UniProtKB/Swiss-Prot annotation:
UniProt gene name: HSPA14
GO biological process: chaperone cofactor-dependent protein refolding; protein refolding
Superkingdom of the source species: Eukaryota
GO cellular component, one term: nucleus
The protein's name in its UniProt record: Heat shock 70 kDa protein 14
């Protein structure tokens, strides 16, 4: 049987298939192995991928990009607010949901982020079917380690709406290790692996322990202010300054001209990973004036040196979190398209001079290949439960329970700190006045660091129809069990009457 692995990133998507014992990435109908995660809307059609990217200059207000950044998030989420400010396609709130407003001239329509993701998943399914046939729909989807339950759920729903049978979701660093066979090549050995992922909009670094074929995340960190787009923007700003120097026109305030410069900078950036220089020619950039500029790799490296330094500093921070030094790392895995940049690879080699740097698989294909391998494992062993097939993980975020302090203000108690090895079990006693007939236990995830932390509610358990007491308090015992696959089972029991309620929050599969 055949299976599929899909990685939907912020700027691109990629699909791999597992067949006859091996996993391979499938090229789309344009012949490209990676598809831009962009959807453009016109009067009569919805266009996905390269065609949408190429048309965005003339149809920018109806072109949706980076949908993954807003998927499953509410309007008051800090990341949503940042996205709404930066998006060229208008995002509004309607009936409590975020929607894209599409105006093609005849009428306005409103499109959900989940529906945009559905179209991208449909493109991935169509690409996979080109080599597997239409009967193959079993898929494993990758998710960032810091995705919350709502983001995972939205991603899974979009994939199912596209016609996929979602076997499960797998964390991106785990997929990267699977792609290189780490843990399978020496199942009895123990090693520490650093996974460096520099994607389109973010940098994610994880330190993972591999022991007897089992994966465990020791520490992880994501920085949404460093990504391939930031390198492109840096180069585009330089090109804008060169145009101004040559023609005395500042185009930084012209959205159309800057989009052209971004396209040119993106092409030049990719060329500079293999060439010493790249030519950037833009036809009629501004007021009919063509622009022709040559950029050397040395110039690009100088412009982006602050970003390179931030990447290396992020590695040092993750090592410190895990209590490791560079000498404790056995292998470094590179993934994400921007990890191709030669200067960045050299800086990582300098930091880990005695460590094997794994980059033989194209870095933007590593994660979907690992997902396809996981899908092959799952469908190949029908008697294997999803939990048993899953590499051991740790909790990605702090899991908290909401309470009230002595002053009456809301307070939060951390039950599962980020990084808790799974499986894990916690108990929490909730006290409530005996005079009320229902009690609600609210569960939250935290995002961000220190003063920037934000608590997001993702589940609740309600005990109803409790017998009222005139005096005193009632004790509600909550038992929370998080399995190896990240699913959470919660049981709340009234200690006096034995009445209980239970819920299970699945791992969005």
């Amino acid at each position: 049987m055949a299976a599929i692995g899909v990685h939907l990133g912020c700027t691109s998507a990629c699909v791999a298939v597992y067949k006859d014992g091996r996993a391979d990435v499938v090229a789309n109908d344009a012949g490209d192995r990676v598809t831009p995660a962009i959807v453009a809307y016109s009067k009569n059609e919805e266009v996905v991928g390269l065609a949408a990217k190429q048309s965005r200059i003339r149809n920018i207000s109806n072109t949706v990009m980076k949908v993954k950044q807003i998927l499953g998030r509410s309007s008051d989420d800090p990341q949503s607010r940042k996205y709404i400010t930066e998006s060229k396609c208008l995002v509004i709130e309607k009936n409590g949901k975020l929607l894209y407003e599409i105006d093609t001239g005849e009428e306005k329509k409103f499109v959900s982020p989940e529906d945009v993701a559905r179209l991208i998943f449909s493109k991935m399914k169509e690409t996979a079917h080109s080599v597997l046939g239409s009967d193959a729909n079993d898929v494993v989807i990758t998710v960032p380690f810091d995705f919350g339950e709502k983001q995972k759920s939205a991603l899974g729903e979009a994939a199912r709406a596209a016609g996929f049978n979602v076997l499960r979701l797998i964390h991106e660093p785990s997929a990267a290790l699977l792609a290189y066979g780490i843990g399978q090549d020496s199942p009895t050995g123990k090693s520490n692996i650093l996974v460096f992922k520099l994607g389109g909009t973010s940098l994610s670094i994880s330190v993972m322990e591999v022991n007897s074929g089992i994966y465990r995340v020791l520490s992880t960190n994501t920085d949404n202010n460093i990504g391939g787009t930031h390198f492109t923007e840096t180069l585009a700003q330089y090109l804008a300054s060169e145009f101004q120097r040559s023609f005395r026109h500042d185009v930084r305030g012209n959205a159309r001209a800057m989009m052209k410069l971004m396209n040119g900078a993106d092409t030049a950036k990719h060329s500079l990973s293999t060439l010493g220089s790249a030519n950037c020619f833009l036809d009629s950039l501004y007021e009919g004036q063509d622009f022709d500029c040559n950029v050397s790799r040395a110039r690009f490296e100088l412009l982006c040196s602050p970003l390179f330094n931030k990447c290396i500093e992020a590695i040092r921070e993750v090592l410190e979190q895990s209590g490791f030094t560079a000498d404790d790392i056995n292998k470094v895995v590179l993934c994400g398209g921007s990890s191709r940049i030669p200067r960045l690879q050299q800086m990582i080699r300098d930091l880990f001079p005695a460590v094997e740097l794994l980059n033989s698989i194209p870095p933007d294909e590593v994660i979907p290949i690992g997902a396809a391998i996981e899908a092959g494992i799952l469908i190949g062993k029908e008697s294997l439960s999803v939990e048993d097939a899953l590499q051991i993980e740790c909790s990605a975020k702090d899991i908290l329970v909401k309470g009230v302090d002595e002053s009456g203000a809301n307070s939060f108690k951390v039950l599962f700190p980020s990084g808790t090895p799974l499986p894990a079990r916690r108990q929490h006693t909730l006290q409530a006045p005996g005079s009320i007939s229902s009690v609600c236990l609210e569960l939250y995830e935290s995002e961000g660091k220190n003063s920037a932390k934000v608590e997001n509610k993702f589940a609740q358990v309600v005990l109803q129809d409790l017998d009222k007491k005139e005096n005193g308090l009632r004790d509600i015992l909550a038992v929370l069990t998080m399995k190896r696959d990240g699913s959470l089972h919660v049981t709340c029991t009234d200690q006096e009457t034995g009445k209980c309620e239970a819920i299970t929050i699945e791992v969005a599969s």
